[in-house]
């Protein structure tokens, strides 16, 4: 917005003083009462009394008023005073130009809305982490579900880590280790994006009146974020599991059509209950431990990528060890023809069939997968958050420089 001015002239007002006027808002030309506040802004004021003639040239600032007083002797020994107050430009007029953005590349990130940047950061972090650890995930799924897939007649109730690796390589080749990864990536992009974005959102909601986030608040934010992302992407998780462990399927569309034809829409939500029960504490513990451990480090270490990686490994190890049995239960309930009707039914059934160790089938490959997976995801997201914060500071610095250059000279006194 450009500068707007109006001119008011007062004639034949003897001993014109500021006390002669009562306005609804503080006038920019007021003298005695404004001296201290304007000096703090670096402005200078002339005397407090006008005689004979006074003219007022006024333009109002939205955020602050800067005035220029010029006192000159008029005819008959009278004094003439002029007040000029300049309207500032709108904030967007101080925004960096294209040339300034090119000179400061970090500021380019601020072009993307912060919420959108966080959302896409979560998506990228999840996809990268999942693709790297896909072979370990496939091995874990085979170990977790072998007992149910083999059936009651099979004498071999479980397979080991090395046996699962050998079986995949022998029957399916190298590509077999990434079987089911495409639907997993398709799922993990919205899943990770929603999860990490939701966590940041829930943390804001769960802050106390003092603005601080308690341990319970962090746990609650993590649990809600985990359940939110699971609810949104759950059908894709079921498709990924079926494609990874059931023979005969080659594409995700084949699995989906067969499930609709033979089992109905409800089959896409098999095991949703235990999934929510397992993911809520897992994400709550994982994210909470990551935040708290990172926060407890000396400030100089908090900014280092290595610290984020190690912290994420510790958080993932604690969360995995605590919540893994629930993950095994939900996987077995997702399978076609599962004999289990509830979480308690699955819990007792697995123990009766395989013993307590059955609840931890696939724990080793899962730990090997989840630790780098979580490290890559949380570290990538942490780095992007730092970049976003840095870009905001850079944009503000450039805008402040532009504002200073555009600001008019403040009060100059001439006699």
UniProtKB/Swiss-Prot annotation:
Transmembrane residue ranges: 106-126, 182-207, 219-239, 273-293, 309-329, 362-388
GO MF annotations in UniProt: ATP transmembrane transporter activity
Keywords attached to this entry: Chloroplast, Membrane, Plastid, Repeat, Thylakoid, Transit peptide, Transmembrane, Transmembrane helix, Transport
Compartment(s) where it occurs, according to its Swiss-Prot or TrEMBL record: Plastid, Chloroplast thylakoid membrane; Plastid, Chloroplast envelope
Record bears the keyword Electron transport: no
A cellular component annotation (GO) from this entry: chloroplast envelope
Modes of activity regulation: KM and Vmax values toward ATP only are increased by m-chlorocarbonyl cyanide phenylhydrazone (CCCP). The corresponding values for ADP are not affected.
Name of the protein in question: Thylakoid ADP,ATP carrier protein, chloroplastic
Organism: Arabidopsis thaliana
Gene behind this protein: TAAC
